[in-house]
From Swiss-Prot:
SMART domains: PX, PXA, RGS. GO terms for molecular function: phosphatidylinositol-3-phosphate binding. The gene is Snx13. The keyword Transport applies. The keyword Protein transport applies. This is Sorting nexin-13. A 1,2-diacyl-sn-glycero-3-phospho-(1D-myo-inositol-3-phosphate) binds at residues 601, 603, 628, 642. GO terms for biological process: intracellular protein transport; negative regulation of signal transduction. Its main location: membrane.
Length: 957
């Protein structure tokens, strides 16, 4: 029964559902749900509308007070106050100088307009708030200007800035060394260098590290806000500072509107590179410097940017439709670009493969090196320092020091005896003091190097030593008293296998060649003064005049030869740019006259001059070839000057007296002037020796003459002022004793590392007052890392600079520097700086738009251009003093230092901190900055490391 009943229920239920769906359709369920939702939603809407209406009625009732209305006096007063415009008088005087106040007022106006007014006027039309802000800014500027007038800025600009820059460079140099030492196999990234930089900074500064401010934008903004608030506290009246709203507005304008954009611009590497190029815009980039930069570049991005630009220029040149003379120019340009592209590709492949080639090691393994004679080494500062290092390693330093000491003794003795003979000619009273001092100096040299007590002792023949001792005891000393022994010592150093022969097989010799720029790849040469192949006798190489052999007529006195440089030009041959001189030659005899032109480079003149001065020694004192020039050697004015000098050289050479005095000279002259390609008789090495070493040799030989002439110039002036030559001789005699009684000692390392302190902590007291000497010593030490070099070289450089400055200018440079600082801080220059700031941020009175980021390729090419400019302006004289390789490394180090935004920010903040410490010396700004930087992570690590190293020592106690 139950089963039948359940079946009946299911049956009727199914039938009902089917009928329901047939009647209302299959979507009736969705409609039903929709109807229910609409019903519920409608009820809620009605409820909300009812509540809203009742709420509005209640609020309207609450707005009206139930108290009786007051009189109309208060509303009337409020209306009167609104109608009265409160006038605020603002004194527009800021610094007391109208030329400064006017642009400053414009800066204030533009700042308020672009940072405050554009949003303030949407809130209120009341001008009083804006006037209060303006008054607050003016009060701060007035206090700032007043304080600036009371400060002596000379120590800051001549001492503090130089110390800060030198210290920054030292930290960067040590960071570079530390990154290199960490792992030679894996090249450190820029992030590693920045992190290591701040590690070194905290080790050097001890109590401050600026890593957070320089690497975290959030912390940097907080630092600037705190700094601006401190400045406002010092500059604003107490009433204005207590107004938080006003103070915060001014703080934000200064921090985010002025200081932060300025710091961003000054620390941008691309901006610095463009500024460097602009600063030396007058110097022309030469081919050799450009190719050296590509060869030395380790940045693939730079090489790719140059390669892509070369490919773009190639495509453009190949698309040109040219004919005639232009086709040769286009072909030369295409060849040059192809060569640059090839060098870039080769360098990129080498960097990507990781197979970096050490030029010094490669040259050492190759075995075929230039031979530098010993006499050239002894007169060249750069070469001598390497030979000195080697002699110290082999125990032969006594021989070298003896040779150097005797050279110095000879020059000084000649000078002293010249003074003495001058007194005899003038009939003045004689004194034996000078001879006594010379005898004492000679005896001192004998005791130091040659006596049995000498240690180490110079080993020479005993009879020479005995002869010298007898001369010292019985005769007056002469400048040549040590010549025989010095000659023997020279031969010993030259022939003994321990010394010069072994030095040529040592790695120091290869490094010496690198510093002398004698390991250079010849494929990268080419300039006006280059040593490449001589240019053909004619520009096209196809013009050949049918001339008889000029040398066949040398014996004919009736033949007259005249030549002059008629024109100059700049040529480009396979990427090498050089100057070409067109020489017009006239040959006359009894019956005929012939004329032709030949073309020569400066290197041809140089080679020709070397050949004839070697063959005819008397010409070396008569003929003077115009010297080389490092940069601007393609400048039109320079080429005209050189043309004039070379013309004078030719006219002197072709004088009849000169030709008759040296009949064989005519053969060389005719060969040089003949219309054919000049065959150089000297090799590349010989010309380098003539350029780099021989002038120094000649200068060493002429030191005696230069010193002899001293009493007629500088010393004579001193004598006229003091009228006491005896005192001057006594002082010079004391210098002899101090110079020659002892072997030049090496500077020993102290227990405290001098590298872990600021650069100013290592200067001598007598250097501190000499501003130019101080600046040059700091820059030479830190840029070129002279502390790692031979200390004899460093002392020589210091003495050279010191004597040059003091003897030539005295206090003149100091006065000029002080006057220049006064000029920089004068109202005119301050006004000019404010105007430049105004024009940079608001050109034509309109806020400057954000400069779009320059393309990476453009920035990379700017880097190449900047380095090329720096290389091009480096004088050869600097390379002669400290070495070519050291000069290149120093330039690249300084340039690389400015390629890191974080490190540039650090330098800007260091300069800012020094400026504020100078401006407010009575306040403890140093402690304030230490506190603001106290959250540095590197500082915390350093303190933990310091505590961990000090803990064991404390436990032992």
């Amino acid at each position: 029964m139950l089963t039948e009943a359940s079946l009946s229920i299911w049956g009727w239920g199914s039938l009902g559902i089917v009928l329901f769906l047939i009647t209302f359709g299959p979507f009736v369920i969705f409609y039903l749900a929709f109807y229910i939702l609409c019903f519920v939603g409608g009820g809620l809407v009605v409820t909300l509308l009812y509540g809203k209406t009742n709420s509005e009625k209640y609020l309207e009732q609450c707005e009206h007070s139930f108290l009786p209305p007051t009189s109309s006096g208060v509303p009337k007063c409020l209306e009167e106050m609104k109608r009265e415009a409160r006038t605020i008088k603002i004194d527009r005087r800021l610094t007391g100088a109208n030329i400064i106040d006017e642009p400053l007022q414009q800066v204030i106006q533009f700042s308020l307009r672009d940072y405050v007014q554009y949003w303030y006027y949407t809130l209120s039309d009341d001008e009083s708030f804006l006037l209060e802000i303006r008054q607050t800014l003016q009060n701060a500027l007035i206090q700032f200007a007043t304080r600036s007038k009371e400060i002596d800025w000379q120590p800051y600009f001549t001492t503090r800035i130089v110390d800060d820059f030198g210290t920054h460079l030292r930290v960067f140099r040590k960071a570079q060394q530390r990154v290199t030492e960490k792992d030679d196999q894996v090249k450190g990234t820029a992030e590693d260098l920045v992190e290591t930089f701040f590690e070194v900074e905290v080790e050097m500064e001890k109590d401050v590290c600026r890593d957070l401010v320089c690497t975290s934008p959030k912390d940097e903004e907080g630092f600037l806000r705190d700094l601006c608030e401190v400045l406002l506290y010092l500059l604003l009246p107490p009433g204005d500072f207590q107004s938080k709203i006003m103070r915060y507005f001014v703080r934000e304008i200064l921090a985010r509107g002025i200081l932060l954009p300025l710091i961003n611009q000054l620390s941008d590497p691309d901006y610095i590179n463009q500024y460097v190029i602009w600063m030396i815009r007058d110097s022309n980039c030469n081919y050799e410097a450009f190719m050296n930069i590509i060869k030395l570049s380790d940045n693939i991005g730079e090489l790719e940017a140059v390669r892509d630009k070369a490919a773009e220029e190639l495509q453009y040149l190949r698309s040109l439709d040219t004919a005639g003379d232009d086709i040769n120019t286009i072909k030369n340009q295409i060849n040059s670009l192809l060569f640059v592209k090839k060098v870039c590709d080769s360098r990129i492949q080498r960097l990507q493969s990781g197979k970096e080639i050490n030029t010094v090691k490669l040259a050492a393994n190759f075995g075929k090196l230039c031979t530098v004679p010993l006499d050239s080494i002894l007169v060249d500062n750069v070469a001598l320092q390497f030979f000195m290092d080697y002699m110290q390693q082999t125990g032969g330093q006594a021989h070298l020091f003896f040779w150097m000491t005797v050279e110095g003794y000879r020059v000084t003795a000649q000078q002293q005896l010249e003074v003495l003979s001058g007194r005899q000619r003038d009939g003045k009273q004689q004194t034996n003091q000078t001879k006594g001092l010379l005898r004492a100096a000679a005896v001192g040299i004998y005791e130091q190097y040659l006596s049995e007590k000498a240690s180490p002792r110079v080993t020479v023949d005993d009879y020479l030593v005995a002869k010298l001792a007898d001369t010292l005891n019985h005769e007056d000393p002469t400048p040549e008293i040590f010549d025989d022994i010095q000659r023997k010592v020279y031969e010993l150093m030259l022939r003994d296998e321990r010394f010069y022969p072994s030095f040529r097989q040592n790695a120091l010799y290869v490094r010496m060649l690198a510093e002398l720029d004698m390991l250079k790849d010849p494929s990268f040469r080419g300039s006006d003064d280059g040593d490449g192949e001589s240019f053909n006798g004619s520009p096209t190489g196809s013009i050949n005049l049918s001339l008889d052999d000029l040398s066949s007529v040398t014996s004919d006195d009736s033949v007259q030869l005249h030549a002059y440089i008629s024109d100059t030009g700049v040529c480009n041959d396979h990427g090498k740019t050089y100057a070409l001189y067109a020489i017009t030659v006239h040959r006359r005899n009894l019956n005929t006259e012939e004329m032709w032109k030949t073309y020569r480079r400066y290197s041809d003149f140089h080679d020709f001059h070397m050949r004839i001065t070697e063959q005819f020694e008397n010409l070396s004192s008569i003929l003077k070839l115009p010297g080389k020039k490092t940069f601007n050697n393609m400048d039109r004015d320079f080429l005209e000057k050189r043309k004039k000098d070379l013309n004078a050289y030719l006219q002197l050479l072709l004088t009849p007296e000169m030709m008759k005095a040296s009949p064989a000279l005519a053969h060389c002259v005719y060969d040089f002037l003949e219309n054919k390609a000049y065959s150089k008789g000297k090799g590349d090495f010989a010309r380098k020796m003539d350029t780099f070493v021989n002038p120094l040799r000649n200068s060493m030989r002429n030191v005696s003459n230069a010193v002899k002439s001293l009493p007629d110039s500088l010393a004579e002036g001193v004598t006229k002022m003091s009228d006491n030559v005896g005192r001057m001789s006594e002082r010079l005699g004391q210098d002899i004793k101090q110079s020659f009684f002892k072997v030049p000692p090496l500077i020993t390392k102290t227990d405290s590392d001098p590298e872990h302190c600021r650069v100013s902590a290592q200067l001598d007291d007598n250097v501190d007052d000499n501003i130019p000497l101080r600046v040059m010593l700091l820059l030479m030490d830190e840029v070129f890392d002279l502390k790692e070099r031979n200390q004899w070289l460093r002392r020589n450089i210091k003495n050279l600079l010191q004597q040059l400055i003091r003897a030539t200018y005295g206090d003149t440079i100091n006065r000029k520097i002080v006057d220049h600082v006064d000029w920089m801080t004068s109202p005119e220059q301050v006004a000019d700086s404010v105007k430049r700031f105004r024009d940079a941020f608001w050109p034509n009175g309109i806020l400057a738009e954000t400069v779009p980021c320059r393309d990476k390729a453009i920035r990379m090419r700017t880097r190449i251009a900047g380095k090329t400019k720096l290389f091009a302006i480096m004088p050869d004289e600097l390379k002669h003093i400290i070495g070519a390789e050291t000069t290149r490394k120093g330039i690249l180090r300084v340039f690389e230092m400015f390629q890191h935004n974080q490190l540039n920010r650090r330098m800007v903040y260091v300069f800012l901190e020094g400026f504020l410490e100078t401006l407010f010396p009575q306040y403890k700004f140093r402690e304030l900055f230490n506190k603001l930087h106290s959250r540095s992570k590197q500082m915390q690590k350093y303190k933990q490391k310091l505590q961990s190293t000090q803990a064991p020592s404390l436990q032992k106690r």
